[in-house]
């Protein structure tokens, strides 16, 4: 992994592919490369550094091109290991996302007649294609025969000197086509080409497509198949910085709008009715005995918050699983268990694997995602969209709050279907959902004050975040944000666990961030605050109640927002983390070693 782009058409190919790579930089990478073909020749440009280190190829270098930003999985981040990889003749170029699981056996087979120049799993692909081309077949046929030998996940884009077009292939790794006025694009993410077109085709597992300057054709299992063209509902402007220094800061400030989009048309102004664009029947929801959530990273923390909401307001037992552990745990997912997969991109490999495991065991499945047309929406029985809009920063912000808001809507929907939520609870949750965009805006209006607090703690290198109930997932998520972008150690946990180990690490001036909001057992957490203060810690407290806030050394005052008040605290802590990282001069939008969408297990 991490990003693929390509273009064939009448516009300057090298410039378009280079710009596509720049648009994919947000996904995270450690090396990059471009290959252009045309006029019977192939030119390859690679770097072990940044996309900006690559030259912009001229039109004379080729009329079709592919590019790649690499996030290392096999082999170190060097120029030799950067994509594109070529065959022995230097005529075939391949870029690849995913993992070829049987590459070692294939490489052993090929080494007798082929020379390898990298430590990657990808390099077996151009050598296999070379072998088949030697039989006199077309590039399309050679790729079809090659994919029959591959085990694992892959999104491939291939071009070759002396062969027409670009051939692409997909298996368990995202890949889509873009249809512009001057040619056809291919990418792992529409951000690569959104400035040229919003018309896309999502390739399916097993699809192999042949792109020429005038047409595109898709095959699956050797037969030609039809694939739809869809229009994305966002533009290049939505994916820009809009004058902010970083995408992350822009996306923090977009949260009131994202929340309004998540809520719009789904909740009544007066009653407690919820209308969700999903097809799971009331009967299915009534028969659910347990709900299992599978997710990774920030989405996992949103799942923990959803558990609090569902168990409290829908009287439904919920377990939340780290998706990468779900398959390994054994156990059953019976038909009376609803499995909810939460994934921003809809392409997170571990979450997809967990979803497939649950489906194989007969459980109904629901996807909670931000991405129309993504793999999870096609594989789950139903999908519920969080409507956050494009999120470019590696550190998730607006997608977390949108996931929780959508989970709150789902809680009301399930609670009503099961006759488990009282009129009073439903009204309180409805009011919290409706008030959330305005409450978040009130926090954003305090941005200068929060920035000042963040800068005050920028010299610290270890932070603790504590909370209870819904405050715990917010503590976990806020600690994750800080460690992602500042590179400081940050640990989040239940406030009650302080005395069971973490207290040993608290010394003079240790920053401890305490979520003292409603719906987070603030009085009990305040007792834990006293424990760390007696050991010399500095406590940054987040609360709406002045009486609770007095327990902290530094207070960020929040508006009240009922059961969603901890979400409001999270927004304040996003700003806190951002300004610490900015003061340290960190690359906030592209933190080291991290990728936006993790498409390998």
From Swiss-Prot:
Gene3D superfamilies, per this entry?
A: Glucose-6-phosphate isomerase like protein, domain 1, Glutamine Phosphoribosylpyrophosphate, subunit 1, domain 1
Task: List the GO biological process terms.
Answer: carbohydrate metabolic process; fructose 6-phosphate metabolic process; protein N-linked glycosylation; UDP-N-acetylglucosamine metabolic process
Protein name from the UniProt record: Glutamine--fructose-6-phosphate aminotransferase [isomerizing]
Q: Where is the active site?
A: 2, 596
Query: What are the annotated GO cellular component locations?
Result: cytoplasm
Instruction: Give a short account of what the protein does.
Output: Catalyzes the first step in hexosamine metabolism, converting fructose-6P into glucosamine-6P using glutamine as a nitrogen source.
Every copy of the Glutamine amidotransferase type-2 domain together lies at: 2-214
EC number(s): the record gives: 2.6.1.16
InterPro entries in the record, alphabetically? GATase_2_dom, GFAT, GFAT_N, GlmS/AgaS_SIS, GlmS/FrlB_SIS, Ntn_hydrolases_N, SIS_dom, SIS_dom_sf
Q: What does the subunit comment say?
A: Homodimer.
* Keyword terms: Aminotransferase, Cytoplasm, Glutamine amidotransferase, Repeat, Transferase
- Tell where it localizes: Cytoplasm
Q: Which reaction does it catalyse?
A: D-fructose 6-phosphate + L-glutamine = D-glucosamine 6-phosphate + L-glutamate
What Pfam family does this protein match (any one)? Answer: GATase_6
Q: Where is the SIS domain?
A: 281-420, 453-591
Annotated coiled-coil positions are none
